[in-house]
Amino acid sequence: LIKLLYESKSSCRSLIEGNSFDGVWKDGQMGYAVWLKSVNQQGNCRWCRTTDVTFRNNTFRNVGAGFAFSGSPEVFPVDSALSRVLVTGNWIENINVQPYDGDSRPILLNVNARDVSFIRNTWTGGNFPKDAIIFDISNGIKAVTNFRFEDNVIPTAQYGVGATAVGEGTVALN
């Protein structure tokens, strides 16, 4: 069972650089290449957090979906939600192409992440029937504070930017 190519529930000051990630699909999860979050899974680790993470100059191929970032999505609280994440200079190709199917979204953000930046990345090839970027606010909590998206090449999919329960476009960014 392959759930994700890279996942962090608790890590600080991580640099993921110059790697080649290949092959993940919907099975145990929705096929995301990368999932970062701050998690206190059993209720005994309030200090568990994921902060100060950089993904730089990596290649991702044949994935069901791209990046999913969640501030603190679990029932048990953490002292610090996911924060200070930089994704820069990465190449992502063949999202949601059989047999590597999945959620199909290049970017999913939810549950109060902070200071998330995507700068100079390229997404190419794939099947994007949903939003290119989705802010999941279905639980009434802001998806992300201080989101930066600069100089990227990304397909528009059916919609460019969307937010659950709100819609697409400018309204999704507010």
Residue positions per predicted region:
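Glycine- and acidic/polar-rich repeat regions and solenoidal domains
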Residues: 1-174
